Structure formats: C-alpha cells, structure tokens
Amino acid sequence: MIQRVPDPDDEFLDFPPSTDRLPAPLPTKAEGPVEPSSDVKSLVGEFRTYLQQTILQDTIVHEQTIPSTPERVALKTSHLGPEVERVLSAAGIEHLWSHQEEGIHLLREGKDVVVATPTASGKTLVYNAAVLADLLLNPAGCAIYIFPLKALEQNQLDELRTLLANLSCGLTAEIYDGDTKPHVREKIRKQLPNILITTPDMLHAGILAFHEAWEEMLNNLRWIVVDELHTYNGIFGSHVLHLFRRLNRLCSSYGSSPRYVSCSATIGNPTQLAERLFGRSFTAVTESGAPTAPRHFLFVDPVESPNTVAARLLQAGVLRQLRTIVFTRARVITELVYRWATQHRHDLAQRISSYRAGYLPEERRQIESALTGGDLLGVVTTSALELGIDIGGLDVCVLVGYPGSIVNTWQRAGRVGRQGRESLVILLASKDALDQYFMKYPDQFFGRDIEDAVADPGNRYILKNHLPCAARELPLTADEPEYDGITGYAEALAELAASGDLLQSADGDAWFAARKQPHRLLNMRAIGESWSIVAGASARVADTSPPATESPDSTPTAETVTPPRPPLPGSSDLFGSGNSAHAGCDHGGSPVESEVSRSGASLVRDAAPSARSGKKKRYTIGTVSGGQLYTECYEGAIYLHRGRQYLIGERHSPRRQIDASVVDVPYYTRPKQEKETEIIEELASKPMHGYLAKLGRLKVSSQVIAYEKVRVGDQVIISRHPLESPVQTFETIGFWLEMDAPFKKHLKRNGHHHMGSLHATEHATKSLFPLLALSKGTDVGGICCPMHPQLRKGAIFIYDQYPGGIGLAEKGFDMLDRLLELTLGMVAGCDCGEGCPSCIHFPTCGASNHPLDKAGCIHLLELLSGRADLDPEAFDLPETEDEPPLFADWEIAETDAPPEQEEEDHVVVFDLETQLSAAEVGGWNKTYLMRVSCGVVWDNRSDEFTTYLEQDVPKLIEHLQAADLIVGFNCIGFDYSVLRGYSSYDFRKLETLDMLREIKE
C-alpha cells in the first residue's frame, strides 16, 4: 500500500508581518558596530514587559525564570605545574571551578574522561590545561583536537594561541582541514605542531588515508580531544564510531596509546555514548561548578504563525539594541523570517543576517565575524549556529518551534546569557503535536530527563563503507580487537570480498582493499554526492510551467564569483553597488530587470554581477546533498537563499550542477512523494495486548511524483505539476504493529474509520517519538497500511530514515509501551473535536491529512496500550468483500482441501512453557506478558511431536486451529491466555478438552 508523504522541509507559510505594526526606525548611528547597552539586565526586563503588553499579548501560556547559580570553586587544585598555572593566571583564570578541577584530576590519573556540563561552563579549559601540562613534560608528544565544524576550529586556535603565547617554551598549534592551502598542509606534515586541530572529515580523508605521511604524529600521539560529543549522534555518529575504530587501529600499529578526553552538552548518556564511539572505558564529569545568570523563559502559543511573530520579535529586539538570535527548524523558514524582518526596513537590513548550512564558507565566516564584532545585532539561523562558535554575547533567543529535543533546546538557549548576562528565551509554538504538548505541560519540559544520544555500531551499510578504508590503512583480520562486538563484522567481510571491494589472502587470514583510495568514495555527512546550485542563467517564469533552460552542452561552467547578497554593515550604501541608479537591485548589487505579464506572473532576467562588461557571470549560491536533490531542487522548485527567491532549472549530472535564476514570485513549492515498505527480515518480536510488535529490516521506496505551487498567505494551491524522478530505495531498521482483522471490526462496530484511525495513530506516534531519544523530526518515518500485502493484515510502521538504520527504531521498539502511553495522553488531552495539527495532523503529510479519525485514534491507542479490550463480537467477521479473512493462510488451505472423507477426528495434545514467571510480569492477571518459551504438540495423524519456539507461535496457532479437538491441562485458563499476547484470535472457539476443568467438574 502506497502512502503519499511530503518533503521534510515543507512547513506552514503565511503572510509576512503587516507593515502597520512595525517598530519605529533604527536611530541613525555613526559608522561602526552598534554597542549594546551595558545595563543588559534592565533592557531584558523592559523588553520582556514590552512584549507582554504588545507583540505577545494574551499568547504567553507559561513564564519561568531559571535563577542564577553561584560558582563552586575547587577546594583543591590539580598540580598542573608552575608554567601552566602562570599561563592561566595571565589569562585571568585565578581558580578552577569544581568540574574543571575534577576533570583535570581524572585525566592526570590516566583515565579517559567525558565532560558533559551546560553550554558556556568552561569545558575547554579541562582539556587545554591537561594537554599543555603533559606536553610541557613530554615536548616530543602531540595531541589532535577534533571538532565537528571548521568554524569551531578557528575559535579554538585563537584561544590556544593566547595560552601558548605566554609559555616560555615553543609549543605550537595549527589547523589542518579542507580549507588549508596545499603548501601549508605540506609544511604542517614536515614540521608537525604539538597540537593539530582538524575535523572528522579531514581525519578520514587527509590523515588516515595517508597515515604513512603522519608517522611522527601517530608514533607520538598522547591525546585525542573530541569536542561537541553530542553532535556525533544518529547517522553522523555511526560514521564517526567507525572512524575512531580505524584511528585506534593505526595508533596501536604505530605503538602509541593516546588518552581520550571529550566534551559534550548535557545529554542523558554521556558515558555510554563516549564508550560506544571510541571503544574505551570512560569516566564522566556531569556536575557543573560554573556560575550562571538568570534566564527568563516565555512559552508562547501564538494565534498567528510563529514565523511572522518571530520576524517582529527580531525587529523589536534589534531596535532595542539587544543582540538577538532566531532559531528555525527549516532552511526555508530561516530565509522567510529574515526576508520579512528586513524587506520593509532597510535600516534593519544592515544589522540582521540569515545563516544556515548550504552557504559558502567565506559567506559564513563573514557573518560570524560581523556577529562577534557587533556589526550585526540579529541573526536568523537553523541549527548551524547551535554549537559553540564564538559569536559574542547574545541577549535574546527566539525558538521558532520546539527544536525537537531537550538537548537541542538547552543548547540553543545557552547561546544567550554568557559572561553573566541576564537573558530571555522565547519558545514560539507551532501547531505541531510536540510543540503543543509542551504548551499544555510546560512542567514536562523543565522537569524532563535529558534524552539519550544514539550512535548505532550495527549499521551494515556504514560498516561496509568503512571496512575498505580500514583495509587500505592496514590489512584486516578475522579477529580485530577494534571490531570486537560489532554486529555483522564477519558477514561484512564476506560480502565485500564477494563484491570485489576486498581481496582475501591466499591463506584466508587477511583482507586487503581492492581500490587504491576507497576513502574518496565515502561521505560521512550526506546521503549521496554534493551538488552545486549555480545562479546567473536567464529564465522566463510562466504561471504554471517550468522555465526554459539551456541545453547541457551550451551551459557554461560556473566561475568562482562572489554571489550577490545583502551587504554586511560598513558597506558604502544599502545595496552594496555604490551606484544609486541601481534601484532595482535585490539587496545585493545585482541589477534586476523585471516586468509583469498579462497573466500576472513575473518575468525576471537575472543580469550578471559584472554587468558593465556585458559578460554574464555564473556564481555558486549554495550546495545540496544527493539525498535532498529530488525533494528540494527539482525543476520548477523555488529555492530561497539569503532572502532571495531562485527558480530551479535544469540539472547537469556530469558536473553535478543545478541551474538557478533570481525571481520574485508570490508562491512557494512543495513536492509530493509516494512511499511503500517491504519487510525483509524479522529481528525481534514481542507480544503486546492482543497483537504483535516486531522489529526488523525494511526496504523503503520513495518517489517524487509531482510538486505544487502554493500561494504565500492563504495557502491556496495554484497548480500541480507532474515530475519524473527515479525511485529512491534504501534498507533500514523499523518496528511495526500487526493488527488482525478483529481490530478493524472492533473499530467499525464503534463507528470509526479503520484507515483514518491507523493514519492518525501513525501521525501521533511519530510526532512524539523525539521524546524517547535525541533525534530530529525527520529522523524517523512512518507509514500505515489497512492491509499490508505481506502481512495480510493491518499494520503501522515506524522506521529510521537512513540506510541501515541509526538505532532509533530499536529504542522505540524497546520503549513501545511508554511511547503509546504518551501518544494516548497527548491525543486524548487535545481540546479539538475532529483532529488538528496539535494532535493527529502532521505538517508534512503527503495525503493532505486525509483520512484521519481522532476518536478512532484514541480508541485504537487504548487497545494498543492495553487500556481497553477488543469487543468479543468483533471476532465473528461477516463475509464481506472488503474484509480480509481471519488467519487468511489457514482458511485458504482449508478451501483448497479435497472433499472431506470418513476418517478419525484430528486430535492434538498441547502444552507450553513460558519465559517469565507470574511474579516477573506483575501477577497471574498478566499471563499474556509471560512470553512463550516453547510449545509442544502431539498430532494423532502424524503420530509425531512438534516443538514450536517463540518465533514459531503463528504456526503453533495454525496447528491448533486445524485440529478437531485439543487436549491439555489448564490450557483454557493458562496456555491460551499466554497465546493471547501474540494474537487477537478468540481461542474460545477451539474445541478443547481441558483436563483440569474436567477434574474440577
């Protein structure tokens, strides 16, 4: 059964903020940065009062202040040595906080340590002090610092060099990453610094791949520092897990045994995550001794869209000289909020910028520098600025929608209020179920445990991608210590040898890489190859048709030209062109000629940045991964970048380039997909409340079949356009709930729509999944089927959205009872009548949220969670064409049987044993949870005993159903009750001779 599902980035869009409510103009100031008031506390308080009386009036549902906390100074100090203590003193550090002292002490004891304390608590000092103290005693030693983002590297290098400058000896530090010039790389390899700063990507492609050139470092490596540990979660975490297995192998080969030290935001399982990623035993430091300033929270449930409210809050904050950051959940929303905040306010355009993934590196560095220096007072961003990039002290954080996890929420909130500054955090709820859950239950947010981070070592695709790289670095053997406990290692070796990616030695004891550089084929951050979005081509936009594009042969190669963009502060004029005649420029110095056709559609021609010469320049505006290619950059899509609209044209596969042209149109676009699931392998099964929950390998197929043009404002669909795109297929891990026909009959007898009930339950369950584990809303997918072709019964599937899985589905399977309870409480507690975005609507449902049955969803969740029982009459199914037969395989076999002949009755003798006792499941009234260990059946026709294990329970039930008489002892009171945990079949229908009942009677 195929269900239509949407693009994950599809969001509810609306009218931009109305101009009649805009704040007063920004006062004219002298050239240079805007300096915020020193009295931040009073400004934040006044701003909060202003918002309560104006923009947020009557929409604040909860206010809470996290009070300040005093510092806890270490009672004793680790002996770092006089040199390091002098350097710290020169940096203004006269004492250590308690968690810093604890971490340094553990490191000096030789332990591997993970420090998981809140943002801005001085975690970096732990590893900097310990590493410097050690390298002063061992000057031939070296350390490698690994950061997930290049921007974090530069921050760390600046901080390190400040410390190193005060040392009497010549310890050095350098950055080695993709932006490092070739001649600088060569110099670094020849003159190895004491501290090498890099990223996982460069560690993979530039260091491990050429480890012979790094012999000196690998021989003398004493420290491996990994910052921002919590980011190594999900698919990226699974890649990094194998990356460090490879690094550990090489260190052992070169004779070094470095210590690990890692820092993380506060997560629920720092020790477990570190041990899983690095393959070592860790000690965690989690109690912070750093002081904190008061942080005020406002939970806001706006009547209008949170996107427009965010734009007005950004304007209001910047106009009051409060440094304001707005976090959104999607790139398109980032661009829209930025555009709406600046399009009517040219005075604000110089003080606000957008920032997200996909911007060019030099663009991002320029924005970061302007924020740090105070040239910018406001920024709209996705999660790209969530990490510890130094962008100066911020005062106000606006969250446009719940970020998806407690971890990410606190990480984003931690961007404001540094250096003892009082701060304000505003959570603007969307109508999504998870947002509304916290609007109704704010105490659940503030009192909730931090989520666990998940990194799955068992992803077979990622394992098979890394093993050829590992074999190229060092030949692999069957007994690799670093792969001990990695599920599927032996099978992966065999599969890679069969495919020709690995070559097995003649004696069969070693495996070698078939390719010279398999590292080049592995991208740890994206699904598929990266494509460049190139602007500068002409395009005519019709009302419903995609633009005409040049042929692939005639399209020039993009030149390296800085794209037109809104100017940063300090530009000579507002548009950055230096020429007031360019009144048609779109905030970027690129003259735009436009006219309006009879149909009202814009006809736009994008001239080149070098218009004077008459030569058109093509320039790269961003990149997109192969995984997003067909959902974001299909021909005819509207792509937003720095507040400008670009019409996507043709794709050029050989160069991996996508044409784009500047346009100004009153609509946005969203794709439509079809999906289906196929069960490949069952990995686990457990009885629930009259049904089975199973975990297994799935094949998910999706195809973008069309896109819609949707008018901004009233959300009217202007037109639909078919698309031809390839089917995208991947294997993953998921769990599913199998519901026999009585569930359908029960729902229908109670007046509910079967498919609508399943569909609503899938939506609601998927919405609350991030409460179980650290994940984004797009990390899990779902599909429901009223009659799955393989199962021949109704089913709801929840699966990881990445090839091979990332461990989330296993988490959901293990905590299924909790997930169903949370979902039931959320849906039943919603005040709406027929369903809404706060309970069963899903913002990106490709079926337009139809059909949905809220009452049926509640009823079904009550059945699934054991709060209600199936109606006994639901088992007596009428013979209707639309109802599948109960236990279809058995009934078909009966239909195909030859005419009944005179023979003896079919009698079986049956008994079973359970895995758990009554005490272990909570009493004899919960025998359905005791789980089958084995069942034994003697059959008079074959005169044989048959043993059934738990995975064979469906066959056991079929065997019992096929008998004319079942003989057992207490099978009615006990054995059938245990089997009811696996099936909704009414076992009272079986003709049974229960000897215990016969004795009692």
Question: Where are the regions a protein language model picked out?
Answer:
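Acidic, low-complexity intrinsically disordered tails
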Residues: I2-P23, T28-E35, T555, L574-F575, ...
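Helicase-associated low-complexity/disordered flanking segments
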Residues: I2-S98
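Intrinsic disorder/low-complexity segments
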Residues: P17-P36, S538-K615
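Helicase motor core with emphasis on the C-terminal RecA-like subdomain
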Residues: Q53-S89, H95-S98, E102, R108-E109, ...
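Hydrophobic positions on the alpha1 helix immediately C-terminal to the Walker A/P-loop
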Residues: V126
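Extended Lys/Arg-rich polyanion-binding regions
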Residues: S423-V425, K431-R448, D456, H466-E482, ...
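Conserved RNase H-like, two-metal-ion catalytic cores of nucleic-acid enzymes
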Residues: A888-L965
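Conserved DEDDh/DEDDy metal-dependent 3′-5′ exonuclease domain
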Residues: V937-E1001
